């Protein structure tokens, strides 16, 4: 959702934004844009429209996109029986390109089968796209290598930091106040299995048992996700609920550090957001994070909570308060990595170029 909010907000601020651009945004994205103060009147056709997976087939979306030269689904797959327009689809389904991951290996035989079928079916839908748009080069390489799409039909447009982080006057307060009493570690994201959030209570206990260090963990789960966690998790972790984009900087500001133990991503903005807020980042030692954060994160094996606890304790006891130069350098690294405005321009340019090429052909 963060990407959709950022892209639409940036498009609304472009003087060159096309008059014939139709925006279909979900309720959640629309609410986020309103809180940001985005001028949605800049679009000649802006509609609130919700689609959910396969139900898209009978949602009426087909009639809404009919007559447009290009349809760009920010993150697919796009479930339509037929797409008469040029079909550009954003790809961020890591399970398709990295199927044999740690979470998959923990599944029962039946769940492995259903998982394979689900993502095989999604891959077939992605194959129908005229062009796929990905956020990093490793995703393009994997898609081409697995035959989901020819490399010539895959465009890389780097994801990055939402511009709201650069304008404190746009930040909003949290609905739930955070009362800090000890070193606080935050996580921003959904509670998907591959996010590996089950580590948090284990790390908290290990820090106390092995290092006599008390810490607090804070997460941003929705009500359903929180209700599905164990009593042990709820007794060990604080939940502030889902945040709007404009509230995320405030959340990071109140944390002493950020943790990101994910097993699997195409790309995630959370590591960049932590670094631009000049917070130490404890993250999975995985290529999808190293490619983005370089040497500015503190890395640990996401399968090893002891290693994570030792890393955090080392930081608190030896580095905290002495890493201002590193944190400032990390912020500059993020600012130079990519640009939210340029991402929106690149998306718009891609649509216009493909439409022009098709009309000439």
Regions found by a protein language model. Name each.
Residues 298-306, 314-320:
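Conserved acidic donor-binding segment of nucleotide-sugar-dependent glycosyltransferases
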Residues 280-283:
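Short hydrophobic beta-strand element within catalytic cores of glycosyltransferases
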Residues 175-195, 201-204:
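Conserved donor-binding/catalytic core segment of Leloir-type glycosyltransferases
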Residues 127-145, 149-168:
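Donor nucleotide-sugar binding/catalytic pocket of nucleotide-sugar-dependent glycosyltransferases
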Residues 263:
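Aromatic "clamp/platform" in nucleotide-sugar-dependent glycosyltransferases that forms part
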Residues 39-44, 227-249:
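Nucleotide-activated donor-binding/catalytic signature segment of Leloir-type glycosyltransferases, i.e.
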Residues 111-132:
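Membrane-proximal helix-turn-helix segments that form the acceptor-binding/catalytic region
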Residues 320, 324-358:
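A charged, aromatic-enriched C-terminal amphipathic alpha-helix characteristic of glycosyltransferases
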């Amino acid at each position: 959702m963060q990407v959709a909010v950022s892209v639409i907000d940036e498009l609304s601020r472009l003087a060159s934004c096309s008059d014939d651009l139709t925006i279909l945004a979900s309720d959640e994205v629309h609410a986020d844009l309103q809180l940001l103060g985005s001028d949605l009147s800049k679009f000649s056709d802006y509609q609130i429209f919700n689609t959910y997976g396969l139900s898209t087939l009978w949602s009426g979306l087909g009639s809404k996109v009919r007559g447009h030269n290009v349809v760009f689904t920010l993150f697919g797959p796009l479930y339509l029986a037929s797409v008469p327009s040029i079909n550009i689809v954003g790809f961020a389904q890591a399970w398709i390109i990295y199927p044999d991951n740690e979470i998959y290996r923990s599944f029962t035989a039946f769940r492995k089968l259903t998982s394979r079928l689900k993502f095989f079916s999604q891959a077939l839908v992605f194959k129908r796209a005229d062009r796929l748009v990905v956020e990093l080069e490793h995703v393009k390489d994997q898609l081409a290598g697995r035959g989901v799409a020819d490399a010539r039909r895959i465009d890389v447009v780097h994801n990055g930091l939402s511009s709201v982080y650069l304008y404190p006057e746009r930040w909003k307060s949290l609905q739930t106040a955070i009362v800090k009493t000890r070193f606080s570690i935050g996580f921003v994201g959904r509670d998907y299995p591959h996010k590996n959030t089950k580590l948090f209570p284990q790390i908290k206990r290990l820090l106390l048992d092995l290092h006599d260090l008390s810490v607090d963990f804070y997460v941003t789960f929705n009500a359903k996700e929180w209700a599905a966690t164990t009593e042990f998790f709820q007794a060990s972790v604080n939940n502030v609920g889902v945040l709007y984009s404009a509230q995320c900087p405030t959340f990071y500001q109140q944390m002493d550090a950020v943790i990101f133990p994910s097993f699997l991503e195409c790309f995630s903005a959370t590591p960049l957001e932590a670094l631009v807020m000049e917070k130490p980042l404890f993250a999975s030692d995985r290529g999808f994070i190293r490619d983005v954060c370089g040497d500015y994160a503190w890395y640990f094996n996401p399968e090893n909570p002891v290693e994570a606890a030792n890393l955090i304790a080392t930081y608190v006891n030896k580095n905290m308060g002495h890493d201002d130069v590193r944190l400032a350098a990390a912020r500059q690294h993020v600012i130079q990595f990519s640009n939210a405005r340029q991402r929106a321009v690149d998306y718009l340019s891609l649509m216009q170029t493909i439409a022009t090429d098709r009309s000439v052909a």
